[in-house]
UniProtKB/Swiss-Prot annotation:
Keywords: Cell cycle, Cell division. The keyword Cell cycle applies. GO terms for biological process: cell division; regulation of division septum assembly. This is Cell division topological specificity factor. It comes from the Bacteria. Belongs to the MinE family.
Amino acid sequence: MSIFNLFRRPTSAPMARERLQVLLAHERAAQGSDLVAILREEILAVISKHVQVDADKVRIKVDRDEHVSILEIDVEIPRDAQALAA
């Protein structure tokens, strides 16, 4: 490292990249709630084709990390659930 590098301003590319990452994170967070609602309804529709399920017994959890989002879905299916004809 040179003594001249201590007083040099950082280049604009890393700053722009960081700003873009923050902007994308905000956009993904805003779209996430809509996506979760859509996924919930579609997953319920698919499961309901095969087994009778109470919609109130479905729990959805979304965990977001820096690089990954995890969607966890718990569907409570009774042991005596009636299989539906497809």
